[in-house]
Structure formats: C-alpha cells, structure tokens
Amino acid sequence: MKVEPQSSVENFGAAGADTDYSVEAVDLSFTYQDGTRAALRAVGFKQARGEMIGIMGASGAGKSTLAKCLNRIIPEFEGGRFSGSVSIGGRRLDGLRVCDVAAEVGMVFQDFEAQLFSTNVAHEVAFAMEQIGMDRAAMNQRMTPALEAVGLRGFEHRDPTSLSGGEKQRLAIASVLALSPRVIVLDEPTTDLDPEGKAEVFALISHLRERGLSLIVIEHETEELRRADRVILMREGAVISIGPPAEVMINLELLEQSGVHPPSLNRALEMLGIGGHAESVDDAYAAIVRAYPRLESSAQSIAREPDAVPAQTTGASALATVENVSFNYTAGPQVLDSISLAIMPGDFLAIVGQNGSGKTTLAKHIVGLLKPVTGRVLLDGRDRSALRAAETAREAAYVFQNPDHQIFAATVWYEVAFGPRNFKLAPDEVERRCVEVLDAVGLLSERESDPFLLSKGERQRLAVASVLALRPRLLILDEPTTGLDYREQRRMMALVTELNRSGIAIVVITHTPWLVAEYAQRVALIRKGRKLFDGRVREFFADEGLLKTASFRPPEVTRLARRFGTLALSPRELADWVKERV
C-alpha cells in the first residue's frame, strides 16, 4: 500500500507496526541517473532495535548509496532507477519526503564540515529542530542533553569554525541527536580526524550505543567495527558477507579483495598458525600465550634498534631546511613557533601530529605557498624567498590533501602537461614526460579521460603525476591516503615507495599509524607549532611517554608486541619474532 506524503514528522510513527526492527531494507536496487552500472543490487538486511551495524567495502561498493536510501535522499534528491523498500520502526517509507524521515533517521555525512554552517554551536544544534517546527521550549529541553551527550556543553557560543576536527564531528552528531532519531547513520565519521579525534568519536559512538540507539557506521577500517553487533561487507553494490565481526573478519583475503584493511591482530594470528578473531590486544595476547606457553610477558625495556639509513643521505647536504620559522595567519594565533627541520636526499619522512598542530602550514612554507613571519626556508642551500616560483617547483612539489583542489584541466593528459608546457619545454619532451609519469602512476590508458570522472584514488595519483612531470627532488604529500579504501591506500604507498627508491625525497603528512610504521624511515612529531620529536621510526614507536603526550596511538600489533617486551611495526615482524623464540 502506498503511503501518502505527510506534512509533519509528528505523524510518522502513528501508523507504524509494532516491530523489533529499527530498519528493514528489502531488495534495494539503484542505478544513478547517468550511471551504466547498478550502485546497489538487491541489498537487504534487518537491524534490531539498539543494534550497531558496521558497513564495510571498497570505494564505490555502494555503502553511501545504501545509507542515502534509508532516509529518502535516494530517490527523492538523487534520481535514478530505484526499486525495493525501506521500513523504519515498521513503517514503510514509500512516498515520504526527506523532511518527513529526518527526525527518524539522522545522518552524519562523510564530509561533516559541509553540515556545519551556523554562527555558533547553539544555533547549529537548533537549526534542524527549527526546520520541523519545534517550539522554543521543546528545543531548549533537547539542546542541553544533546550537547552533554557529545561532550560539548559549555560550547554553546563557540563559532563552529574554531572547533577541532573531533569537536566538529561531535557537533554534527549533536545536531542529529537533538531530533531524537530511532537510527543514526554515520558515513565514515573519522576520515579526516587525527588519532585523538577518532578516539573521541568512537567513544561517543560507544556511549550512544549504551543509550540504546540503533547505529549504522560506515568504515574502511576494521579496528573499531569489531565492537559492532554485526558487520555487512559490500562489493560492487551487493552484500557478500553479513554476520558478527568474529565470523566476517577472519576471512582476511576476502576483506583485502573487497578493499577493507584486514585486522592486524587477526593477520598476526594467521601468520602464527593460530587463526581466529581477536577483539582486542588482550585477546590476541591470550591466544598467542595459549598456543606458545613458553612465551612470557617481559618487563624489559624495548630495544631501540636503528632503522637502516638510506645510502643517499650519507655526506649529503639538505634538500630543504626550515630554520626557526614562526608563522600566524592574519589576526590569528601562532601556528608555527620557532620550528626547524632538515629534509635530506633520499628521506622518507612522515610528519605527524594532531589536527591544527601546524603540519600543513609547515609544508606550505617549504614549497613557497606561505611566507614565514620570522625565520627562513632554504631549498638546496638557497633562501626560498629569493627563488622564482618555477625554481621552487623544480626543487619541491606539493600534493594537496584534496586532489580536487589541484585538478582543473579537461583531460588527464592536459592536467599532466600543464607544468612542463609552462616551463616552455619542447612538445616532444612534454609528450615524453607525460607518458613516463602517467605510466608510472598507472593512468596511461586514461590520458583522454575527464579527470573528474576518475575515482578518488585515481585523482590522487593524477595529482602526483602532474607534479612529477616537473621532476622535483622533493615530493610532499598531504594525507595521500585519506578517503581511499585499503587497496587504493596500498597502491598509493607502493607508488610513493617506488618514487623514493628512484631518488626522490618523500614527505608524507598523515594521521595513519600503520602507514607510518610500515613505510616511513623517519618521523617528525609536531605539536602546537613546535617539533617534539625528529628521529627514526622505531625510536618513535618505542617511546610510550612521547606517544601518550602526542595522543598518537601506535598500531595494535605494536601494542601487542609491547606486551612481550619487544617492538614490532607489522604483523610479519611480530610473527617472525615469536617464531624465533618457540
């Protein structure tokens, strides 16, 4: 039976059936207006009241499309061929408008900052309530509990733009909570957050779960979803696995093939011939000790073995030198505070730190996008302020966190050719360089394609290709794996590693601990505009006090290794260490 559109969400639940399910999705299929391939293919699931479901899958698997079907954004706002049905609390959504469903299914989008636009926190939380016609007294009754629930009480008069990344995400969640929805959908809620911000958001998710809310969390990473009641694994618009995390997350090859990062603890257990699912470091430790009783936890201090020093650094002078640089934006607080840093030939340096610590600001000084208030930057021993833009571009290149801020040409080939042509290179040299770098990043077959029709991972690689065509000696990448699925992350880092081996110095700004552990040779930790640490990766991860001060959580496998009194940066390292001792 078709339900006629309602004029108010007040009436939403009136005709709802008595049901134990918050969400029932039946045979959902959808193809976007201009799409040639189905984004969803006969997807169905039921969510019990108070259940937390995680949805995993590669970019383009259909996760966000499925989420938009749950609150009528599809097919109401985003048109295409839609079939199937969704019921919320036993009431089918057929014919309802997005505004009718908003108070029942709250959604926090992947780009949570796009949801924030008011002048202060209180107005932000009030906005959605105003739109459904709630009176002021009711709004005031809901405002404080919503802010308390997310830890933002007392922030009512703060400008949202002044909040940290984690605080902004919590504000977006508070705006949804104020509507008292049955279901909250969070689409990759921690994508742009530092480890501390991620911990804040998932602590909040745990709190909401304890309150009995039904939660659907979309994630690339498996670590936090292990605590879900069930997980759904999607590939190419279809559900390929559904069940408790302990069942789904032991199929490591299927996860990897589906663009999902397999849990590192499960990988270590597999490499040791133990297998199974570890929900925590404690679980993994217990499983290893049961399998290998001779292994005992050691209280000894962790040996700080030096990493191998690349041959290129021996006796070399710095490619880039930052000398006592301080900087603040107009009328703003100090972002860099007398910071110094040297980048050597052959370096593979990871710059880490909390959101707002000054990492990107530092990188922009190196490539000349910003000028220091005090101090100076040298490129190959020359003061960068005296260099022309073209001279800087030949020495140091910068790839933005969002490749769409860098891409503008009509075709992939013209995007890559733009720099060499500006340098007045001969046409045959331009062609040679374009072919060379597009082949290196795996995009040669896309040379005539529209860049904006490429996937996020492909656009990221195109941005790298466009600066590589100038043959810089130093390449700086700002969060190069943000928004990419696991396969894309590995492909991007394999490319970056190969560039480093070819002689290009690499600087990666990142929040991802396993990426630092497995790829970088050196780490610089920035906190409040100052450099707290600059040294080898093993030394960094061995310093528990430093990591705690910086709110930087090491990979789980590193935490597990510490229980045995050793240091391991990957599942393979830990497995090898155990096998040597049993």
Question: Which residues does each predicted region cover?
Answer:
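Catalytic Walker B motif of ABC-type/P-loop ATPase nucleotide-binding domains
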Residues: 184-187, 475-478
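The feature captures the beta-strand-to-loop junction immediately N-terminal to the Walker
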Residues: 56-58, 352-354
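Conserved beta-strand-loop-alpha-helix hinge in the C-terminal portion
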Residues: 238-265, 530-557
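Conserved ABC ATPase signature
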Residues: 159-163, 167, 450-454, 458
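Conserved ABC ATPase "signature" region
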Residues: 137-155, 428-446
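Conserved ABC transporter NBD signature motif
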Residues: 79-91, 375-383, 392
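Helix-to-loop junction immediately C-terminal to a conserved catalytic motif
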Residues: 71, 367
